[in-house]
């Protein structure tokens, strides 16, 4: 599958003929080499015998080895240009962006596709205690506990079994499952992995990415 982009220089450009046959790949072209704005979107439909051609026990790239061989042998190799939603989530910023796009319905994915604005999605097995504040759009998964005074703000994603302690704030952050956000802590546009522990009055600011099992002690600023 191909998709058009404004700037193909960061991607693999794909040239096709008028019938959709792929004629050339050009990885990260220079501006003067651009002949089309269609790039490789990374989605393929392969015949079963493709896997018989993949050598065993060696490093091998389907894009760099198999696809060029199809062109050289003039085998059937067709492209479909998708003009719908597509995003490269290879950076933390784009990873955050795709969640926001889903919540804003730029991409019609469940559960937000069928929700009325402001479409906060809260699993029936989550527990939002009295005095907590939820502002949509946001996503709160099963088993989440949000304690009094805590706030889950717009574009936040809170994974399964997370605990958000009293007066903590999650604003536009993505928090994977089984993490605990301590009292008075604040997360702003950050990404946290699984099983993280954020201590009391910790501040985690925009652009921060914490891996699985990260722990920040009380009053830390990152």
Where are the regions that the model predicts?
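A short, conserved acidic/glycine-rich loop-to-beta-strand motif
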Residues: 1-4
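Catalytic-core segments of class I nucleotidyltransferases/pyrophosphorylases
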Residues: 6-8, 18-113
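Glycine-rich phosphate-binding loop of ATP-grasp-fold ATP-dependent ligases
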Residues: 9-13
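Short, ordered coil/turn segments that flank beta-strands lining enzyme active or ligand-binding pockets
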Residues: 18, 124, 142, 160, ...
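Glycine/small-residue-rich pyrophosphate-binding loop that anchors the diphosphate of NDP-sugar donors
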Residues: 40-43, 58, 118, 136, ...
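Nucleotide phosphate-binding site architecture
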Residues: 51-52, 135, 153, 205
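Extended, small-residue-rich solenoid/repeat segments and analogous flexible loops
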Residues: 72-165, 169
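Glycine-rich hexapeptide-repeat left-handed beta-helix
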Residues: 163-222
